[in-house]
Amino acid sequence: MFLSAVFFAKSKSKNILVRMVSEAGTGFCFNTKRNRLREKLTLLHYDPVVKQRVLFVEKKKIRSL
């Protein structure tokens, strides 16, 4: 019997790419990577719309890295 790549399970990646959205309500967002096993990110980052540092929260997973 010949084994092909179809029969082997894929391993999950260690990091994922996530979208961070501003809590100031400006709609500004950026992408960053985080460890898969870590909880959802919340961080202070510069928002150019309001020209100050505001809270950003993780809204959705974009892809595996």
Swiss-Prot record:
Q: Where is this protein chiefly located?
A: mitochondrion
Location of the protein in the cell:
Mitochondrion
Q: What is this protein called?
A: Large ribosomal subunit protein bL33m
The subunit field of the Swiss-Prot or TrEMBL record says: Component of the mitochondrial large ribosomal subunit (mt-LSU). Mature mammalian 55S mitochondrial ribosomes consist of a small (28S) and a large (39S) subunit. The 28S small subunit contains a 12S ribosomal RNA (12S mt-rRNA) and 30 different proteins. The 39S large subunit contains a 16S rRNA (16S mt-rRNA), a copy of mitochondrial valine transfer RNA (mt-tRNA(Val)), which plays an integral structural role, and 52 different proteins.
GO cellular component terms listed in the entry, alphabetical order? mitochondrial inner membrane; mitochondrial large ribosomal subunit; mitochondrion
Source organism superkingdom: Eukaryota
> GO terms for biological process?
mitochondrial translation
Q: Which UniProt keywords apply?
A: Mitochondrion, Ribonucleoprotein, Ribosomal protein, Transit peptide
Question: What Pfam family is a match, any one?
Answer: Ribosomal_L33
Q: Where is the transit peptide?
A: 1-8
Q: Which organism is it from?
A: Homo sapiens (Human)
Gene3D superfamilies from the UniProt entry: Ribosomal protein L33
As recorded in UniProt, coiled-coil segments are none
